[in-house]
Design a protein with these regions (language model features):
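ATP-binding/phosphotransfer module of carbohydrate and carboxylate kinases, centering on a glycine-rich
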Residues: 15, 20, 184-187, 191-317
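Glycine-rich beta-strand-to-loop/alpha-helix junction loops that act as flexible
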Residues: 66-69, 150-153, 273-277
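Short glycine-rich, Thr/Ser-proximal phosphate-binding strand/loop in the N-terminal lobe
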Residues: 4-42, 297
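Short glycine-aspartate micro-motif
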Residues: 5-9, 62-64, 145-149, 272-273
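Short beta-strand-loop/turn "lid" adjacent to the catalytic site in phosphate-handling enzymes
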Residues: 56-121
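Short acidic-glycine loop/turn motifs at beta-strand connectors
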Residues: 21-25, 102, 158-163
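N-terminal phosphate-binding loop and adjacent alpha-helix
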Residues: 26-61, 70-77, 188
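Glycine-rich phosphate-binding loop plus the immediately following alpha-helix
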Residues: 113-217
Length: 317
């Protein structure tokens, strides 16, 4: 089949590109570490190199990019869409790349900004594309509900009639990585390997009693900074083995996220997670502890559905 367009999830540290044909079928995928930070000042050259070295791709293919590529650290700043915009309208707001060569159709997906009545402001870039993909992959039932998009910055989103009505971001993955690499907990937490996009822990942590203990402790509602120091106190007094600290801290952080954000979902509906299997499993463990229904949606399939739907609609330059 002949390639019709390229979709790129261009994050802070990583980039994943999909080559797709006119029927929406995936022809090939590529992933690398040419994220927004690594590409500073050379985004155009990086994209042209990606296309030039990709069999089946041609320079004139339309390219749709989402994520931090449209942020202040990205290629060009694309203004956020505001909360009242319907997700289904996302393709109508694609922004052309200002310095694209003549004849090239390169576009960046805008991020999302939500301002609450009490003055709280939250934003996202990239996750709006996945939510758009969920609407197209799942159909009308996806227009209402609670979604979790875990990662370095975990997003909890409430949709109503296809519009984002609530958005809460948690620095769960970033905090775990910082605690594991720096400070007084680092030596204990580094005794167990991390994995996953957010580095939260290996798959077996789901069945680890220390992880579940951390989730349960967070459910009690302690001040998180105090609970985190409690991990150090347990290790230095011998109440906790050093190798258990990473699982316990992982449970505290994800558990604190759940303790606050689960209110976005009603008791009679599932919490839907869009993410890789390792992180989804951690969130599923939290859902079980809180007595919540839970559904896992494959992030890769969601992303491909988004690219297909965007390419199928008219692109307004």
């Amino acid at each position: 089949m002949t390639a019709a367009f390229i979709g790129i999830d261009w994050g802070t540290t990583h980039r994943r590109a999909a080559l797709i044909d006119a029927d929406g079928a995936l022809l090939d995928e590529r992933a690398d570490d040419d994220g927004a930070l690594a590409c500073k000042g050379r985004f155009r050259d990086s994209l042209e190199a990606l296309v030039a070295g990709w069999p089946g791709a041609t320079p004139v293919l339309p390219v749709i990019m989402a994520g931090m590529v449209g942020s202040a650290i990205g290629w060009q700043v694309v203004p956020y869409l505001e909360g009242g915009t319907a997700l289904s309208d996302l393709p109508r707001h694609l922004q052309p790349v200002a310095d694209a060569p003549a004849g090239r159709r390169w576009f960046i997906v805008p991020g999302w900004c939500l301002r609450s009545e009490d003055g709280d402001i939250d934003v996202m870039r990239g996750e709006e594309t996945q939510l758009f993909g969920a609407l197209h992959l799942l159909g009308p039932d996806a227009s209402d509900g609670c979604y979790v998009l875990p990662g370095t910055h975990s997003k909890w989103v409430r949709l109503h009639a296809g519009r984002i009505t609530e958005l809460r971001t948690y620095m769960t993955g970033e905090l775990f990585a910082l605690l594991r690499q720096h400070g007084t907990l680092a030596s204990a937490m580094q005794s167990t390997p991390a994995s996953g996009a957010a580095g939260l822990h290996h798959d077996s942590v789901v069945d680890d009693p220390d992880f579940l203990r951390g989730v349960a402790e967070a459910a009690r509602g302690p001040v998180l900074t105090h609970a985190l120091f409690g991990a150090r106190a347990r290790v230095v007094t011998g109440a906790m083995a050093p190798g258990a600290a990473a699982a316990y801290v992982s449970g505290l952080l994800i558990g604190a996220e759940w303790a606050d954000a689960q209110r976005l979902a009603s008791r009679d509906e599932p919490v839907r997670v869009i993410g890789e299997s390792a992180l989804a499993a951690l969130h599923a463990a939290c859902a079980r502890l809180h007595g919540r229904r839970f559904e896992t949606l494959d992030a890769r399939q969601i992303q491909l559905a988004a690219w297909r739907a965007m390419a199928a609609e008219e692109i307004h330059a």
